[in-house]
């Protein structure tokens, strides 16, 4: 499992001109799932993200988690994170999980994030989405389970 995490001042996701998920402050997650991922990977990443200290304390040191800051999460499925661009000019997506399996694991992952005590908004799995955010910092990290 691969997640691109962005500390966000605000974020939203729109499908067909309608906002389907929106947060005022917290983390925007682009979530990629490969065919080798399991529920164990999803739980590991959910716990890691909820407790990752990437928000500044009063002295400017990254010392607080999204939980500490009472932030929210906007989670967006993104199979293109497993695009392989090493050969040719078109990405190969063979490492991305098949949609049925990926959707199950994506839903499970979001529930695991909720179990950590976070409010989670989502995009629409498999849809073409427009994602808008103000990246705070900017702070952008890649979190992987393997």
Curated annotation (Swiss-Prot):
Which SUPFAM superfamilies does the protein's record reference?
DTD-like (SSF69500)
Q: The motif Gly-cisPro motif, important for rejection of L-amino acids: which residues? A: 137-138
Q: Which GO terms describe its cellular component?
A: cytoplasm
Species in which this protein is naturally found:
Bacillus mycoides (strain KBAB4) (Bacillus weihenstephanensis)
The protein's UniProt keywords, in alphabetical order, are:
Cytoplasm, Hydrolase, RNA-binding, tRNA-binding
Biological process, per Gene Ontology: D-amino acid catabolic process
Return the EC number. 3.1.1.96
Report the sequence similarity comment from the record.
Belongs to the DTD family.
The name on file for this protein is D-aminoacyl-tRNA deacylase
Q: Does the keyword Transferase apply?
A: no
The family database entries (Pfam families) matched by this protein are listed as: Tyr_Deacylase
Q: What class of enzyme is it?
A: hydrolase
User: According to its UniProt record, which reaction does this protein catalyse?
Assistant: glycyl-tRNA(Ala) + H2O = tRNA(Ala) + glycine + H(+); a D-aminoacyl-tRNA + H2O = a tRNA + a D-alpha-amino acid + H(+)
């Amino acid at each position: 499992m691969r997640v691109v995490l962005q500390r966000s001042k605000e974020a939203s996701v729109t499908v067909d001109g309608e906002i389907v998920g929106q947060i005022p402050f917290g983390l925007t997650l682009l979530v990629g799932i490969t065919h080798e991922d399991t529920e164990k990977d999803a739980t590991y990443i959910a716990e890691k993200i909820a407790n990752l200290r990437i928000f500044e304390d009063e002295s400017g040191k990254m010392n607080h988690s999204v939980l500490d800051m009472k932030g929210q999460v906007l989670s967006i499925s993104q199979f293109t994170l497993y695009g392989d661009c090493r050969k040719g000019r078109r990405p190969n997506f063979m490492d991305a999980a098949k949609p049925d399996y990926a959707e199950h694991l994506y839903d499970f992952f979001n529930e695991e994030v909720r179990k950590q005590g976070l409010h989670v908004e989502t995009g629409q799995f498999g849809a073409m989405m427009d994602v808008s955010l103000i990246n705070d910092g900017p702070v952008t990290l890649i979190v992987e389970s393997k």
